[in-house]
């Protein structure tokens, strides 16, 4: 079974689906991650691998830390900040 990927927002889901059309994501909708989202992540982790894939900035790090504290057992995937800036000078991956 494929993992569930935790991302920050819709744009992240859209970008991942350009590469992996069937990928399942949980969107945190920013760094103010709510209890409903935590519950979704906890439920997903009961039956699937969960990978947190957030931006390498302060909000992304904050989200990773909150999830790690509240949902032990998730895995993390992220790019170092220096490698995250696109070549065409946009800030987002």
Name these PLM-found stretches.
Residues 1-23:
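Glycine-rich, flexible N-terminal cofactor/catalytic loop recognition
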Residues 18-19, 23-24, 31-93:
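TOPRIM fold recognition
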């Amino acid at each position: 079974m494929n993992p569930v990927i935790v991302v920050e927002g819709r744009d992240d889901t859209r970008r991942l689906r350009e590469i992996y059309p069937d990928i399942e994501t949980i969107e945190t909708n920013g760094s103010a991650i709510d209890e409903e989202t935590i519950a979704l992540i906890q439920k997903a982790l009961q039956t699937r691998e969960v990978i947190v894939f957030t931006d390498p900035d302060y909000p992304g790090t904050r989200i990773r830390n909150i999830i790690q504290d509240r949902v032990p057992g998730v895995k993390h995937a992220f790019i170092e900040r220096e490698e995250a800036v696109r070549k065409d000078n946009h800030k987002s991956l």
